């Protein structure tokens, strides 16, 4: 057999291949775009393998070099634009032999695979067989010894693309939050018809072996009952379900009933629980007009949400870095995420743990299966069970342990505020505490606490909090006023209503309010109670956390806005939109949105704006448009934080670009303003609100029975709950090591150390701005387009 001609010498630049395999997931295109552009920026060549492993086996035109501009506009596209397939040929050694030959012919020695556990298992098997495959290719005369010398080692990096979020070792997989968004949108829409006709709806969602989508959608929509594969219902579940639904409708006045069921749901004997069976039970036993809605493949479709765009982009960049860092001895990694931190996890360890869960379910070892799920999954399941209904007599505390906990919103409205309050109230009612909502912030407390017949301080009923499950903004009212405006009256109100704990939901003003109360404890003993801040602000500028409720809702609203105006810009071919974002003196929203929409440039207050920067960026735009040559998706977006510069305003920048363009392209200013606060909260803000609010209540509970002086002496009696790296933790506000002294930039109303600042360089790399004018590969690729 004739030997195939392949490069005898290794190419001057390393060649990295990227493929998507298995079921498609929103965000896969973002991952491919990031791999391609980061590879080019790093001096490598990027190759796309079309139609998954099938393309690797067939070779030829199914393995193509991809240039910088080839992936323009991919972030907002759903599915996978390089195709995906479940390849039977690659499962056989003969198929993998062909794949190895095709890779060597193309000079590719590294592969980034985006897919589920099956796809990643195949990738690791391919790597383990690689030396044997090369040896066989030489023996059969397909390749020569000289041809395989540069390719003795195959580096493989995995990215988990799966809407089910079924991979162990990671909090989220690419596509899972986009799918969850589709489900929540559908259930939110069902609410109206269910309420109108007092109907019940059984909603079937995807998830054969993993109940993540079902659990998170149940939390996000306040479902009455839930079925997931990992934790089947106990014997007699039919009676339990009917009892809860009957109580919710007859005693609590609910007009709608929602039951969420994962497609892989079963009982403890592994008998399948179908949506039609559940419908029949509700219809026959409760005489409830019930409908079944099977969402099906709508859960896979559509553009990726903000989180999936950001996650896929950052993981794609990290995958290229991992390839370049790997040695012949390095195990294949999969890029995972824990809370807010990217990690490199041994691929086979993650795959093994994932398969073990499915095996344990099949063996009916359900407790062990739950144990192998991430701790976050178990925590959410516990939270759902204990907030879906107040009927938990075993959890009720004795009288002397019960507390009166005030809940107040401070600052601007943010998505998730209502959900945090709902979760706190539900938990309090489950435990026997009294939850007191303070309406309209501290002014409401001081001015209207004695109003009749309705005081601004009042208990929240189960029926009232249940209506907040998908509501945006703040139903109890919020404003920016602080307690220092009237300490005397505030303290008297604390005494009058006998507050034993304070739960404050809000932004930097909430942080400031608790700081003021803490510092006033010596003069006002009423403030010697445990106080917790749950950050909720679109600006994400609260010290002690890398995530604030509302920031994800804001980003989703903003990318929808940017996608729409980019379409306008692209339709006009040569147009730049300068979009003004909110965020105060923190550039988090602008930078993260810039990453999610593929902005050409992002201006933030941390860096400021000067004339040299603008001149360089205008040259950058000129170069962009000069090389477009009528290409599609040619519209450009620039994001500017509202306080990035007092001189170079959004309109001024747009006018400067238009003037300097000399008619070759044009620009427009766009200010979405308060539209960025969003409508209904995103699923991420809903579920994190539940988890963090319950943790806050549990933290306040630890102070039950302590004296006022004991509480004041405890540095954790005034805290902020937050995400830091891979952990969720409480950070003390006071003391020499507290947030107030060490992490707060009071003048600029933001943390001193902003974790996201490194993202700015990633935005610049992927837009090409970082390498413009430096002769880097990122722009020489235009000559090859």
Curated annotation (Swiss-Prot):
One of its GO biological process terms is: fructose 1,6-bisphosphate metabolic process
Task: State the disulfide connectivity.
Answer: none
The species is: Aspergillus oryzae (strain ATCC 42149 / RIB 40) (Yellow koji mold)
Compartment(s): Cytoplasm
Q: Which UniProt keywords apply?
A: Allosteric enzyme, ATP-binding, Cytoplasm, Glycolysis, Kinase, Magnesium, Metal-binding, Nucleotide-binding, Transferase
Recorded E.C. number(s)? 2.7.1.11
Cofactor entry: Mg(2+)
Against HAMAP family, the record matches this protein to: Phosphofructokinase_I_E (MF_03184)
Positions binding substrate in this chain are 162-164, 199, 206-208, 263, 291, 297-300
- The molecule here is called ATP-dependent 6-phosphofructokinase 1
Q: Name the Pfam families for this protein.
A: PFK
- Description of how activity is regulated: Allosterically activated by ADP, AMP, or fructose 2,6-bisphosphate, and allosterically inhibited by ATP or citrate.
Where is it predominantly found?
A: cytoplasm
The positions annotated for binding beta-D-fructose 2,6-bisphosphate are 480, 537-541, 575, 582-584, 642, 668, 674-677, 749
Functional note: Catalyzes the phosphorylation of D-fructose 6-phosphate to fructose 1,6-bisphosphate by ATP, the first committing step of glycolysis.
* Pathway noted in the entry: Carbohydrate degradation; glycolysis; D-glyceraldehyde 3-phosphate and glycerone phosphate from D-glucose: step 3/4
Family classification: Belongs to the phosphofructokinase type A (PFKA) family. ATP-dependent PFK group I subfamily. Eukaryotic two domain clade 'E' sub-subfamily.
UniProt region (C-terminal regulatory PFK domain 2), positions on chain: 404-785
- Molecular function (GO) terms listed? 6-phosphofructokinase activity; AMP binding; ATP binding; fructose-6-phosphate binding; identical protein binding; metal ion binding; monosaccharide binding
Catalysed transformations (reactions)? beta-D-fructose 6-phosphate + ATP = beta-D-fructose 1,6-bisphosphate + ADP + H(+)
């Amino acid at each position: 057999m004739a030997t195939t001609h392949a490069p005898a010498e290794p190419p001057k630049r390393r060649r990295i291949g990227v493929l998507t395999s298995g079921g498609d997931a929103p965000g896969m295109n973002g991952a491919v775009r990031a791999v391609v552009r980061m590879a080019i920026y790093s001096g490598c060549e990027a190759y796309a393998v079309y139609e998954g492993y099938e393309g690797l086996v067939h070779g030829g035109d199914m393995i193509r070099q991809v240039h910088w501009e080839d992936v323009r506009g991919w972030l907002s596209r759903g599915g996978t634009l390089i195709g995906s397939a479940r390849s039977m040929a690659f499962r056989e050694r003969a198929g993998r032999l062909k794949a190895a030959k095709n890779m060597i012919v193309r000079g590719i020695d590294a592969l980034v695979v985006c897919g589920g556990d099956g796809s990643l298992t195949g990738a690791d098997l391919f790597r383990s067989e690689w030396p044997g495959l090369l040896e066989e290719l030489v023996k059969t005369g397909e390749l020569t010894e000289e041809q395989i010398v540069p390719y003795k080692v195959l580096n493989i990096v995995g990215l988990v693309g799966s809407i089910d979020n079924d991979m162990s070792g990671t909090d989220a997989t690419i596509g899972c939050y986009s799918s969850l968004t589709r489900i929540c949108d559908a259930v939110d829409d069902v609410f109206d018809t269910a309420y109108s006709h007092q109907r019940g709806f059984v909603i079937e969602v995807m998830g054969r072996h993993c109940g993540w989508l079902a659990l998170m959608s149940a939390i996000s929509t306040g479902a009455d009952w839930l079925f997931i594969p990992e934790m089947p219902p106990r014997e007699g579940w039919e009676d339990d379900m009917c009892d809860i639904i009957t109580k919710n409708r007859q005693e609590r006045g609910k007009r709608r009933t929602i039951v969420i069921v994962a497609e892989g749901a079963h009982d403890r004997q592994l008998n399948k629980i179908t949506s039609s069976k559940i419908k029949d039970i509700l219809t026959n036993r409760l005489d409830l007009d019930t409908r079944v809605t099977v969402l099906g493949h709508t859960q896979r479709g559509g553009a990726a949400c903000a989180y999936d765009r950001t996650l896929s982009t950052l993981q794609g960049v990290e995958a290229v870095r991992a390839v370049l860092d790997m040695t012949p001895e390095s195990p294949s990694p999969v890029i995972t995420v824990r809370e807010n931190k990217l990690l490199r996890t041994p691929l086979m360890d993650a795959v093994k743990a994932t398969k073990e869960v499915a095996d344990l379910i099949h063996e009916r070892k359900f407790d062990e299966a739950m144990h192998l799920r991430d701790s976050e999954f178990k925590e959410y399941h516990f939270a759902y069970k204990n907030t879906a209904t107040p009927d938990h007599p075993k959890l009720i505390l004795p009288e002397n342990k019960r507390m009166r906990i005030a809940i107040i919103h401070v600052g601007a409205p943010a998505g998730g505020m209502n959900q945090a309050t709902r979760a706190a109230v539900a938990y309090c009612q489950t435990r026997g505490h009294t939850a007191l909502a303070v309406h309209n912030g501290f002014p409401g407390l001081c001015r209207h606490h004695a109003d009749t017949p309705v005081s601004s301080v009042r208990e929240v009923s189960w029926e009232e909090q249940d209506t907040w499950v998908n509501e945006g903004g703040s139903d109890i009212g919020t404003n920016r006023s602080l307690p220092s405006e009237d300490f005397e009256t505030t303290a008297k109100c604390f005494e009058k209503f006998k507050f034993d704990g304070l739960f404050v939901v809000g932004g930097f003003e909430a942080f400031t309010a608790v700081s003021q109360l803490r510092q006033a404890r010596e003069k006002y003993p009423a403030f010697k109670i445990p106080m917790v801040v749950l950050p909720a602000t679109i600006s994400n500028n609260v010290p002690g956390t890398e995530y604030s409720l509302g920031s994800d809702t804001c980003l989703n609203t903003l990318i929808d806005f940017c996608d729409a105006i980019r379409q306008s810009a692209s339709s006009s071919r040569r147009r730049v939109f300068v979009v003004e974002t909110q965020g105060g003196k923190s550039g988090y929203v602008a930078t993260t949105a810039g990453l999610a929409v593929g902005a050409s440039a992002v201006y933030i207050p941390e860096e400021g704006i000067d004339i040299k920067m603008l001149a360089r960026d205008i040259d950058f735009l000129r170069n962009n448009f000069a090389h477009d040559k009528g290409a599609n998706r040619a519209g450009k977006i620039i994001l500017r934080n509202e306080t990035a510069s007092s001189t170079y305003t959004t309109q001024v920048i747009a006018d400067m670009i238009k003037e300097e363009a000399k008619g070759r392209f044009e620009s427009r200013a766009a200010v979405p303003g308060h539209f960025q606060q969003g409508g209904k909260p995103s699923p991420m803000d809903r579920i994190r609100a539940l988890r963090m609010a319950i943790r806050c209540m549990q933290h306040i509970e630890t102070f039950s029975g302590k004296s006022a002086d004991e509480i004041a002496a405890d540095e954790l009696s005034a805290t902020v709950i937050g995400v830091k790296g891979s952990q969720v933790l409480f950070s003390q506000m006071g003391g020499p090591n507290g947030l107030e002294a060490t992490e707060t930039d009071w003048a600029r109303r933001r943390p001193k150390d902003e974790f996201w600042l490194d993202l700015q360089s990633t935005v610049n790399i992927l837009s090409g701005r970082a390498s413009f004018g430096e002769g880097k590969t990122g722009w020489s690729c235009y000559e090859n387009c």
